[in-house]
Structures are given as structure tokens and as C-alpha cells.
Amino acid sequence: MDRISSLSNDIISNIVSFLSAKDAAVASVLSKRWQNIYTIVPNLEFDNTLENQGSLTDFLNGLLALPASTRIKNVSIKRRGRDGPNRDADLNRFLCNVLKRGVLKLKLDIWVTLDGRYSLPVEVFTCKTLVELELGSILQIDLVPENALLPALKTLIIDAVQFSDQSGCAFQKLLSSCPVLVELRMLNVQWEHWQWSRRVSSPTLEKLTMNHRYHFGNTYYDMEGITFDTPSLTSLKYYDLPPKSYPTVNLDSLVEATISLTLPLHHAWTGKHARRGDTVPSVTNLIKGLRNVETLNLSSTDTVAAFYFSNEAIPVFENLHRLSIATEREFCWRTLPYLLKKSPNLESLVIGGPLHYNYQLGDGYESEEIYSEDDDEEESESDDDEPICECLSDYSFLESCLVKTVEISEYSGTKIELKHMKHFLEKLSCLELVKVFSHERDEEEHVQLRTNLLNLPRSSKCKTQFEFIPPRSSV
């Protein structure tokens, strides 16, 4: 008996996973026992950006040398640039072969040159075993066959893929061919270049991520509308430039949502602020569609502003327990009262940025230095010069809140921030915990920051936690 045959099946299988398809085919003649174990290949990967990878043609020949009974679990293909005159034909021959071998996960990262055209083989859309399919990037899908069916597919990822079916909606055909789809990730999309029905529809979908590729300074964006018909969706991460409207929004099962809208140039949230030729998108239906969420993250200040200008559409969030809002130091908090008044069961409020101040007061309130009582001796500020912005008025909207936890993600300990915290601690009668995240400083400043905050009056049950975050490396 040779030494390899004396190893356990698990060890041999692990060794096999590191071999190329061609080498494995040669090695499979070592013994009958090896051949039996090699009926399943855990991973098959090709990446022509790596040294000594060889050509796709060689890789294909190695695959064809495997016994027809060999099954392959995971396949990953990364192709950049040109790889021989028959690169597209070789790639499709390779895909047609592996898709007959019971593949569970297929990842394609294919760059298509601008002067070339490439079409995926029909077999990609009719594979009965695929559980996860990832398509990218700079890939164009012109046609999804009428007989498309991916009966086992649960996860679909499309990255920088463009759909442009002239005879119908290839994107919706693809979704309709996935009867048990659970998760859809749409990354680096550019709707404005798609030819589609502007509809995301799936009765089984539970997790959805949509991420628009945004170019800074982009002025051309004229999407008519996007419809969400996803009644089983529980998790939504939506990063986009807002279309003109959201005709239909069916998100009745939604539990958690992260919304990040970026308003392009020549767009305005309200006609009052629009200039001639500006587009005024309506997010009313999108806001109403979020009514059942338990966790809501408004992760851009443009999104927070959209809620303010559409405040009449804000529903009562009966199930909302955790709310996160993005802030900037000079960004007005006028949306916050509307959100808190419509969230009767809110328990956790996360301020995703610095605390807001009345920047129009100027000197003394822009300072990033930690407040010290000695500063008062050098100031002659009148009590009438309240640095709190009018958007928060007297903070009376906090008095009816049941919030138990407040998190501040960027706390500097300045005088204005202490005034903010004083209002939070006084008005939030149910407050039990304040979490403060601040950048690392020297020990003396740490002590000063802690002391200032801990000395503020509060309920006896309210505790304060501090976490000092190290600065990001510039490397």
C-alpha cells in the first residue's frame, strides 16, 4: 500500500482541494481508493491575474480530464483582459461542463472589454443544483431564456452587471426563474443604463441589498420610479440616488432597514428649494412602506432630510425599537422630533455622528477642545446666547419618549455637547444607559471628558459607558 492510501479520507480530500483540475485528473490514477474519494471536488478556482495560473484553455483541458462522475461543489472564475483568441468559447465550454457536475456555488468575475460582446451560456440559467450564484463584473445580460429555471437558488449576487433586454425585462425574468430565492445583493448598479421594468418583485425574497454606483458630481439621473413587490422581505439595505417616485412599495414583513439616499446635483427634496429644471423626487411611498420595521438606520444626512420634507408621510412606527440617524455638526436636527413622536415604543436611539450645534453663534462653539470649568472664567456669554439650534426648541419632544439607551458615535466633550447631553439626561425619564464613543486622547483629557459627563444630573438608574476609539491608520 502506498503512503497516500494509508491516509484518512478527510486528509486526502483536503489535499485534493489544493490541486488543479489537470493535476487531480493525473493523480486520480494512483489508486482505486483515490478515485473514489475524488468523486467530489470541494473547490475549483481559476484566476488569470495570478502568476503561474496558466491559460483558461489549459484549465479547461484539466477539467475535461476528470471522470464524468466527478462532482464539484464550488467554482470561482476570475478573468481579466484577454486570454487567448478563443477565450469566450473556452469559458462557456468550461461553464457548461462544470454545471453538469452538481455545482452548488458559482462565482463569475469577468471583465468584458468595451469592444467585445460576451453572452453567458443558457446552462447558467437552467442549472438545477445551484444554491448561490454571483455574476460580475462589467457583464451585460441581454437575454434570459424563456425556459430559465434555477429551482435550488437561494442567493443571487450581481455586481456591476447591466441588463439590456430589448424584448422584455431580463432582470425580472431572472428573478422569476428563482422560486426559492432568499437573498438578493445588487452591487454597483447603474439603473440609468439598464433597460428594465424598474420593478423588484419576488414572493420569497427575505434579504435585499441594493447599492447604486455613485459618481461624485453626477448630474444626470432621471429614473422614473422603482417598485418593490417583496412581501416576505425582512431585511433591506438600500443605497441609491432617488428616482422620481416609488409607485408601489410592498414591504409588509420588513424587520430591519438601512436607507441611504444621495441627492444628486440638480435635484431637490421640495419644489420650494428647486431651481428651474431641477428634479423633485417623491419618497412618500418608500417612507410609508417602512412602517413595520423594528430597526431603522437612516445612514445619510440626505435621507434624514428627505424624511423631514416628507414628514406628513411618516407613519406611526409601532414596532420600532432601535433608530439610528446620520448627523453632521452643522446639519439641522429638525427631522428628529417628527421621528420620535411617531415611534411610541422606541427603546434605543443612535446618533450616528457628532451632536448638532447652532453654528451661527460662531466663536466658542466650533471648538473641538474638551470643556473645562476654567473656560467659564474667560467668557462673558449671556444666558440668552443658547447654542442649541432652533430645530430642537426646548427639547420638549423628548419628554414623552420611552427611550432607554442613547448612543453617541462621535463625542468630543465640548461645551455645546454637554448642553445637549444635559437635555437628554433631564428630559428622557426612562433613560437607563448612555453610550459615548470618542477618539482616543491622553489620560488627562479622558478623565476630564468622563468627569464632565458624569457630573450632569440624571436619574439614579442611568449609567454611562465610555469607549475610546483609536485613530485610523493613514497607511
Curated annotation (Swiss-Prot):
Coiled coil regions, renumbered to chain: none
Signal peptide: none
Domain F-box: residue ranges: 1-49
Pfam families in alphabetical order: F-box (PF00646), LRR_At5g56370 (PF24758)
Gene3D superfamilies: Ribonuclease Inhibitor
Name of this chain's protein: Putative F-box protein At3g58960
Organism expressing this protein natively: Arabidopsis thaliana
Lineage: Eukaryota, Viridiplantae, Streptophyta, Embryophyta, Tracheophyta
